């Protein structure tokens, strides 16, 4: 009985440490190999050249933060010579009963309209390499400096206060 209790306590401590590590910022991250919309290998664009605003999105919840993201895009609130933004579709966490190729086609039709850069992560490559923790059913917004430091992360629906913190953090990188 004592062994089971000790194992449970140990497991809880390990999970807490992993969760805390996943959220500690700033921290170094590396350029990760992902896929383009044609399922070809690709690296994160502008890595080391510009600061990056990355939207890592579970396709099950593409509308989380939609009003805020639309506001940023339409007002060009975070546009600047030192920052670029792009999206990465978190395909692994999608429960959609459609093949990944259909999700890629939907994304491709959207990029044709707005010129956005969208990549795909078919197997948690980004979330694992960067120790992001659970990103299922989350619209994850991140800021990475051109030096490769993850300086901001928000997962899920952002409060007004969190939106303001994001804008303040991004303003420093423009």
Indicate residue ranges for each PLM-predicted region.
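Thiol-/selenol-based redox modules, centered on thioredoxin-like
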Residues: 137-174
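Structural microenvironment flanking redox-active thiols in thiol-disulfide oxidoreductases
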Residues: 62-110, 127
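N-terminal "domain-start" segment that seeds a small globular fold
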Residues: 21-42, 63-67, 115
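Bacterial N-terminal signal peptides
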Residues: 8-17
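Bacterial N-terminal signal peptides that target proteins for export
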Residues: 1-8
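Short active-site neighborhood of thiol/selenol oxidoreductases, capturing the structured segment around
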Residues: 43-68
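Structural micro-motif
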Residues: 29-30, 113-117, 132-142
């Amino acid at each position: 009985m004592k062994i089971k209790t000790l194992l449970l306590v140990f497991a809880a401590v390990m999970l807490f440490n992993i969760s805390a590590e996943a959220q500690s910022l700033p921290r170094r991250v590396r350029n990760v190999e992902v896929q383009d919309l044609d399922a070809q290998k690709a690296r994160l664009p502008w890595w080391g050249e510009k600061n990056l605003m990355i939207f890592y999105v579970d396709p099950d919840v593409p509308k989380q933060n939609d009003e805020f993201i639309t506001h940023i895009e339409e007002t060009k609130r975070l546009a600047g010579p030192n920052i670029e933004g792009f999206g990465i579709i978190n395909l692994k966490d999608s429960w959609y009963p459609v093949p990944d190729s259909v999700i890629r086609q939907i994304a491709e039709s959207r990029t044709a309209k707005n010129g956005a850069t969208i990549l795909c992560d078919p197997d948690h490559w980004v979330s694992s390499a960067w120790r992001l923790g659970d990103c299922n059913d989350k619209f994850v917004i991140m800021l990475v400096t051109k030096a490769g430091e993850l300086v901001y992360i928000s997962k899920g629906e952002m409060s007004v206060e969190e939106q303001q913190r994001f804008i303040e953090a991004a303003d420093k990188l423009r």
